[in-house]
C-alpha cells in the first residue's frame, strides 16, 4: 500500500532523477530499531541531525501516528513523560512535523493508517502545510484491467478477495492469510 508506494516507487524515482541515496531517509516508526523515535523530540532531533549539511533531504516518516505525545520536559525536570495529546503542555507528532516543515532543506512525507490520521482536524492542525492523499483498495475497474480476464471471472475474484493491492498480487494460497492479517491489524490495532 502506501508504505510500498513511498519506499519503493517514489524513492526509486528520486534516485533515477539524481537524488543521492544518502539524501533520502525512510523511518518506519512501527519497527523496533526506530523505537526511540516514538518520542517526538527525539524524532525531530534525529531528522534534523541527519539532514544537517545537506542542501535538500527527503524524509519519509511511515506510521507517524505511532509517535507518542509527551509532556514538555522543561516542566518535568527534563523527563520525557507520556501525555495525552490534549494535555496543555503536550508535545505531539504534529508539533514535530510543524517544526520539521519549517526547515528549508527538508521535503517531508508522512504516512498514517488509523483513525487518528483520518480526522478532519489533521488538516487544521497542520495549518495548511499539508496535502492529504488517501489510498484505498483498487476499484473493480482497476482490478479488472490488471487481471485481464473475462469480466465475470474478475468480478467473482474481486467479490471474494477484494481489491487490496497486496492481496491482488498474491497467489491464491496466500490471499486468505494476508486478508486475515490485514483484518487483525485494522480491527485490533486501530
What are these regions (language model features)?
Residues 5-9:
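Hydrophobic positions on the alpha1 helix immediately C-terminal to the Walker A/P-loop
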Residues 11-23:
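Post-Walker A helix-loop "phosphate-sensing" segment adjacent to the P-loop in P-loop NTPases
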Residues 36-37, 65-96, 120-121:
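Conserved ATPase-coupling elements of RecA-like P-loop NTPase cores
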Residues 134-190:
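Interdomain hinge/linker elements that couple catalytic modules in large macromolecular machines
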Residues 115-131, 147-148:
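Short regulatory helix/loop adjacent to the ATP-binding pocket of P-loop NTPases
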Residues 25-55:
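Short glycine-rich substrate-engagement loop in P-loop NTPases that contacts/grips substrate
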Residues 27, 59-62:
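Hydrophobic positions in the central parallel beta-sheet of the AAA+
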Residues 60-61, 107-113, 134:
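Structural recognition of the conserved hydrophobic beta-strand(s) that form the central parallel beta-sheet
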Amino acid at each position: 500500500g502506501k508504505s510500498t508506494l513511498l519506499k519503493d516507487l517514489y524513492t526509486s524515482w528520486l534516485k533515477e532523477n539524481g537524488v543521492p541515496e544518502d539524501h533520502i531517509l525512510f523511518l518506519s516508526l512501527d519497527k523496533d530499531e526506530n523505537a526511540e523515535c516514538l518520542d517526538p523530540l527525539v524524532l525531530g532531533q534525529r531528522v534534523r541531525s541527519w539532514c544537517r549539511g545537506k542542501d535538500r533531504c527527503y524524509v519519509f516518516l511511515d506510521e507517524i501516528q505511532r509517535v507518542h505525545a509527551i509532556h514538555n520536559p522543561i516542566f518535568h525536570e527534563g523527563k520525557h513523560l507520556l501525555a495525552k495529546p490534549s494535555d496543555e503542555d503536550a508535545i505531539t507528532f504534529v508539533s514535530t512535523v510543524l517544526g520539521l516543515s519549517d526547515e528549508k532543506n527538508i521535503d517531508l512525507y508522512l504516512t498514517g493508517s488509523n483513525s487518528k490520521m483520518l480526522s478532519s482536524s489533521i488538516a487544521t492542525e497542520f495549518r495548511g502545510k499539508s496535502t492529504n492523499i488517501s489510498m484505498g483498495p483498487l476499484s473493480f475497474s482497476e482490478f479488472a484491467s490488471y487481471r485481464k480476464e473475462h469480466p465475470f471471472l474478475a468480478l467473482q475474484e474481486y467479490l471474494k478477495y477484494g481489491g487490496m493491492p497486496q492481496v491482488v498480487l498474491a497467489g491464491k494460497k496466500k490471499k486468505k492469510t494476508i486478508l486475515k492479517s490485514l483484518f487483525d491489524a485494522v480491527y485490533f490495532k486501530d
